[in-house]
């Protein structure tokens, strides 16, 4: 949590003076004035799902309206500039898919690193169960798709049903939040993060065509340089931004999809603050003591220059006392949720929707493999892996969660919209017929998974676990 925000929200002269009696008072007062971080995260994800839904509906309407030609023109509109003999331009769709989506994957990388260092993945027992469930939820859908497309040129799409859309899945779960334990939401977040790791590895290894060893070596060298700089204590954001852009560009030129660079660069972002907690509290306490001695007037950072500088000092202490990784993650949360992902949905979700096209999609091996992979494969893979993990004591479920909750969550995990669509655009970029079928089936499977999961959690799981549901409803 950003201590600067906590401090500024709770700042008043009476609250400051009390810190001299209790060195933790500032933190406690700030924490009391805001929602728990995970609740804020859930709310942000639910909001993101609304924006994604609006963008998706807009794309579907646009692509099926009388203005569909303008939709296609927008997607393929060339954007760029000329500088002498240098020409840099690309279609809007490629700019979003190869450029803006790197920011999304960078954000995912920050989440992964935080979870491994300080989240559920930092606890061995939780980590084992999450990884086991995620592997089941990736392998089973991929196998099902491959069975339907064995020896066909569409077999390359086996990675499409492996993914879960975190924003949409969490948004769906919040609709039945009163009937499920809050720990189920946290479990889904951890599961989705491991799922994202798997999807990123699949993209890097199996959805890359020709590779330039020279550019790839340069990119990895730059990323290694960032890792060394992190170890050496370099914390300047501009340093990581400039070197990171160079690493992204060279990876793009190498042939490996640049989203992999986004994740790799994120893993080099410093996770430790410049000021250790004890030193931070000591400096803040000393500054507040100095402010307390000035009893001639009320704190006025606008009218009084000295007060202004003292408040800025505390702000700087807070900046140095928070982890860059967490600050960057917080800073990117809204831009990614409200801008990057909706734009991606807008240019990629526009497919022809009709009863006849749906029937045609479900008769195609691509569509059938994706729908059954997401709806049935995710359910069987996640819940089956969880049952095996409990049966053989490989791991345990968080408190308040039972198998009925896991079954409902595994159905909702079949919502694979963003990442599944992204993998489809990579696998079927030169096969527009397959791509159209894949996009339509992803939408249908995601909608069906959401309906089945919500009905199960609302009707069956809630009845079998009334105590946990009622307790959660009181929170």
Curated annotation (Swiss-Prot):
Keyword annotations: Antiport, Cell inner membrane, Cell membrane, Ion transport, Membrane, Sodium, Sodium transport, Transmembrane, Transmembrane helix, Transport
Subcellular location as annotated: Cell inner membrane
Catalytic activity: Na(+)(in) + 2 H(+)(out) = Na(+)(out) + 2 H(+)(in)
GO annotation, cellular component aspect: plasma membrane
InterPro entries: Na/H_antiporter_dom_sf, NhaA
GO molecular function, one term: sodium:proton antiporter activity
UniProt entry tagged with the keyword Membrane: yes
Topology in the lipid bilayer: Multi-pass membrane protein
Record GO biological process: regulation of pH
The keyword Ion transport appears for this protein: yes
Chief location: membrane
Transmembrane regions listed in the UniProt entry: 44-64, 92-112, 130-150, 156-176, 186-206, 211-231, 232-252, 255-275, 331-351, 368-388, 406-426, 442-462
PANTHER family, per the entry: NA(+)_H(+) ANTIPORTER NHAA, SODIUM ION/PROTON ANTIPORTER NHAA-RELATED
Family: Belongs to the NhaA Na(+)/H(+) (TC 2.A.33) antiporter family.
Protein task: Na(+)/H(+) antiporter that extrudes sodium in exchange for external protons.
Protein name: Na(+)/H(+) antiporter NhaA 2
Lineage start: Bacteria, Pseudomonadati, Pseudomonadota, Gammaproteobacteria, Alteromonadales
Name of the gene encoding the protein in the UniProt record: nhaA2
